[in-house]
A protein has these predicted regions:
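Catalytic tyrosine of NAD(P)H-dependent dehydrogenase/reductases that use a Tyr as the general acid/base
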Residues: 103-107
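Key DNA-contacting residues within the recognition helix of helix-turn-helix
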Residues: 17, 88, 139-140
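C-terminal secondary-structure termini that scaffold catalytic or DNA-interacting sites
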Residues: 158-164
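Active-site/catalytic core of tyrosine-dependent DNA strand-transfer enzymes
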Residues: 49-101
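Conserved tyrosine-mediated DNA breakage-rejoining catalytic core shared by Y-recombinases
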Residues: 9, 14, 18-58
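Catalytic-site neighborhood detector that most strongly recognizes the C-terminal catalytic loop/helix
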Residues: 37, 131-156
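Short, polar N-cap/turn motifs at the start of nucleic acid-interacting alpha helices
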Residues: 24-26, 101-102, 122-141
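C-terminal catalytic core of tyrosine-transesterase DNA break-rejoin enzymes
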Residues: 4, 8, 108-134
Length: 164
């Protein structure tokens, strides 16, 4: 559930792991990130899609059967939230089990989110706000590493001659 949520919202792992249930606005498909949990110490709002909403609703039903923790992703024994290092270790373990490259990290989900948003036509200003960057320049430096294949696909849907 955390993996899906990070991929669909662009949140950092630390932001996602510290979420409280009250940070969610399921009906509006949004999450209000508290300033103390963001890298830049500035509150922001992120969003998620319909599929993620359905998964989150099921997760909440499951979670509530096992713990009364206020955290969205609690550790059952303590009621605290899952620690970043524990999630990273499990993430790496599951990559290995699936035969995937262990070089992937949870932050790759954020990178993938940003790249897919750009490839799907989102403007860089909106993306920068969603990612919580202090400026568009930060977003450009971090996420504009498109491959030739990426550029080719984008070009084909925007070719000036194709639309004459």
């Amino acid at each position: 559930v955390m993996t899906l949520l990070m991929l669909d919202s662009g949140m950092r792992l630390g932001e996602c792991s510290a979420l409280l249930v009250e940070d969610l606005e399921l009906s509006r498909r949004r999450i209000n990130l508290r300033a103390e949990e963001t890298k830049g110490r500035v509150a922001r709002t992120v969003f998620f899609g319909e599929k993620t909403e359905r998964v989150l609703r099921r997760w909440l039903q499951f979670k509530d059967r096992y713990t009364e923790s206020d955290y969205l992703f609690p550790v059952r024994e303590s009621g605290g939230h899952i620690q970043v290092s524990n999630f990273e270790g499990n993430f790496k373990k599951y990559l290995t089990r699936c035969g995937l490259n262990e070089a992937y990290t949870p932050h790759c989900l954020r990178n993938n989110f940003a790249k897919r948003c750009l490839m799907n036509g989102m403007d860089i200003y909106t993306l920068s706000k969603l990612l919580g960057h202090s400026s568009v320049t930060v977003t450009e430096k971090a996420y504009l590493d498109l491959t030739d294949d990426d550029i080719s696909r984008r070009y084909q849907s925007h070719s000036p001659i194709s639309f004459l």
